[in-house]
Curated annotation (Swiss-Prot):
PANTHER family (alphabetical): HEAT SHOCK PROTEIN 90 FAMILY MEMBER
Identification of the protein by name: Chaperone protein HtpG
Subunit note: Homodimer.
Location (main, coarse): cytoplasm
Function as written in the Swiss-Prot or TrEMBL entry: Molecular chaperone. Has ATPase activity.
Region (A): 1-337
GO CC annotation terms, alphabetical: cytoplasm
Provenance organism: Actinobacillus pleuropneumoniae serotype 7 (strain AP76)
Region named C: 555-625
Keywords: ATP-binding, Chaperone, Cytoplasm, Nucleotide-binding, Stress response
């Protein structure tokens, strides 16, 4: 008998997700059972945790399990647990809404590519709603531990759902799937055993299936519950007993990811610290990777008892893509997030797990370059944050970076700093790099001309974060990183000594020309000088080593912050015919127009834009006319 019944509309994002999910995930529809059993396992974990401080929540039944049964006549499949359960408010919150920030933006990002969408939806975590892949109606009966009032929730997965108060003798949740006619394959004990064995053998909660008992004459004598999984937490087992398939299925259970992980590390540590860790590197970036406020972190267990999801204190922010769990004996069972923040044991575990994660990435890079490239393409931008956040591991983090380079002639970021150092020319003392808005802009920068001529490799950095990265990463393997766009660029032993004498002569020859140009520009430029870094281009602009670069100024602007004005050094190529022609001009107006045009061209090459492009076009048309 139900009372206090009401019909409520789904949150708009739920309706959209249901429709997309049913169509996108149908090809792998059996995952609904994995998701529902995983939810039941989480409910048991939460009850164990709450019962630490309130044992009465067990209500005399501490044997936690999940049961799977079916009724061929009614066409229903039921997944029941005796975990924490839900009250009316929780049912509405958990089953009628999606409490994830950015959900609307995520759904809007989905398109018409079904394969890609299914991957994205899998990363988002479909959970309970996966029931609608195979059911045209879902009924939930639940009672929260320690409460007397139970709740009924029911929906056909369309625009609304019904919620009502009911009676339920036992705590926990029953999810009843009213299967579509074409999904009756799941009303088979053999099929259910197959799926549960495939997806849920690794979880610590016993999964029981209702089986038929027969007497000696082969007649049905009754029903019984049979445990069909190992029911031992995977991470507590010996590594040699666990197959790769089991590790991958546990990853999917843990992360609710739809894809296999790239690599994992399972470690048991005893001695000064006593813990087990299981860390995974995902293959695909989650849709909310760059939302630094989004929850992330490891699942925390203390003495095999679940404590919390997303324990972010055990992994630095730049490794927020890592998935996994930590089971430790060194923390109290009543530990809270606040206690974790200021705990010496936490700091020690964080340092150890960070090292473990970085070693795992090093192993992936060494053993499987193709897989590591997949990782880098997905998570490289986040890993780059590490050089500014983790001084102790800066060099190890930097060794994992990959860059585009003049050596590879490709925008693909495949070159490590160790690769670069191994190819350095004799006498080369620095690692040379160039930052730009894009790979194309970097590859075609006039600053590269001298380096291309001399065959010196330059790293081409075009990610927005790169200017910030090189501000924190000043050296690698004892070699300084040096921007080739700086006015005080020093090639050291790579410089051409014979040319230096002729350059001194040119300095005297062009002295009055430089003074004339400096007089015209006044305070607009820091100084006007001759340069010998160019071969085909008449002029470039550069900044001093201690001054803000163009890319850093753009980074400030992108963050809505006011940056100091960048004052450039204007460098002119004395061997270029255009510079020679301008130096010979006697008409002051003509001289000013030409030198301004060269400056605007140099600014355009450096910044990609001009403050007054119309004036530039007008001046160019005038001089070419």
């Amino acid at each position: 008998m139900s009372t206090n019944q009401e019909t409520r509309g789904f949150q708009s994002e739920v309706k959209q997700l249901l429709q997309l999910m049913i169509h996108s995930l149908y090809s792998n529809k059996e995952i609904f059972l994995r998701e529902l059993i995983s939810n039941a396992s989480d409910a048991a974990d939460k009850l164990r945790f709450k019962a630490l401080s309130n044992p009465a929540l067990y209500e005399g039944d501490g044997e936690l399990r999940v049961r799977v049964s079916f009724d061929e006549t009614l066409g229903t499949l039921t997944i029941s647990d005796n975990g924490i359960g839900m009250n009316r408010e929780q049912v509405i919150d958990h089953l009628g809404t999606i409490a994830k920030s950015g959900t609307k933006e995520f759904l809007n990002s989905l398109g018409t590519d079904q394969a890609k969408d299914s991957q994205l939806i899998g990363q988002f975590g479909v959970g309970f709603y996966s029931a609608f892949i195979v059911a045209d109606k879902v009924t939930v009966k639940t009672r929260a531990a320690g409460e007397t009032q139970a709740v009924l929730w029911e929906s056909a997965g369309e625009g609304d759902y019904t919620v009502a108060d009911i009676e339920k003798a036992t705590r926990g949740t029953d999810v009843i799937l009213h299967l579509r006619e074409e999904e009756k394959e799941f009303l088979s004990e053999w099929r259910l055993r197959e799926i549960i064995g495939k997806y849920s053998d690794h979880i610590g909660l016993p999964v029981e299936i209702q089986t038929t008992e027969y007497d000696e004459e082969g007649k049905v004598s009754g029903q019984k519950w049979e445990k069909i999984n190992k029911a031992q937490a995977l991470w507590t087992r010996s590594k040699i007993e666990i197959s790769d398939e089991e590790y991958q299925e546990f990853y999917k259970h843990l992360s609710h990811d739809y894809n296999d992980s790239l690599i994992w590390a399972h470690n048991k540590v005893e001695g000064k610290q006593d813990y087990t860790s299981l860390l995974y590197v995902p293959a695909k970036a989650p849709w909310d990777l760059f939302n630094r406020d989004q929850k992330h972190g490891l699942k925390l267990y203390v003495q095999r008892v679940f404590i919390m999801d997303d324990a972010e204190v055990f992994m630095p922010n730049y490794l927020r893509f890592m998935r996994g769990l930590l089971d430790t004996n060194d923390l109290p069972l009543n530990v809270s997030r606040e206690i974790l923040q200021e705990n010496k044991i936490t700091a020690s575990l964080r340092a150890a797990l960070t090292k473990r994660a970085l070693q795992l990435l090093e192993k992936l890079a060494k053993d499987d370059q193709a897989k590591y490239q997949t990782f880098w393409n997905e998570f490289g931008l986040v890993l780059k944050e590490g050089v500014g956040e983790d001084f102790a591991n800066k060099q190890q983090i930097a060794s994992l970076f990959r860059f585009a380079s003049t050596q590879t002639d490709s925008s693909e970021q495949t070159v490590s700093l160790a690769d670069y150092v191994g190819r350095m020319k004799e006498g080369q003392k620095a690692i040379y790099f160039l930052t730009a808005d894009s790979y194309v802009a970097a590859k075609n920068s006039p600053h590269l001309e001298l380096f291309n001529k001399k065959g010196i490799e330059v790293l081409l950095l075009s990610d927005r974060i790169d200017e910030w990265v090189v501000g924190h990463l000043t050296e690698f393997d004892g070699k300084p990183l040096q921007s080739i766009t700086k006015s005080d660029l020093d090639l050291g032993d790579l410089a051409d000594k014979e040319q230096e004498e002729s350059q001194k002569a040119q300095q005297a020859e062009f002295g009055s020309f430089l003074e004339r140009a400096q007089s015209y520009f006044g305070e607009r430029v820091k100084k006007v000088v001759l340069t010998h870094r160019l071969t085909d281009t008449p002029a470039v602009v550069s900044t001093d080593n201690d001054e803000m670069t163009t890319q850093m100024a753009k980074l400030f602007a992108a963050m809505g912050q006011k940056a100091p004005e960048v004052k450039y050094t204007f460098e002119l190529n004395p061997d270029h015919r255009m510079v020679k022609k301008i130096a010979d001009l006697t008409d002051e107006t003509e001289f000013n127009d030409w030198i301004e045009l060269l400056f605007e061209q140099a600014l355009l090459a450096e910044r990609g834009s001009l403050e007054n492009p119309a004036a530039f076009i007008k001046r160019m048309n005038k001089l070419l006319g």
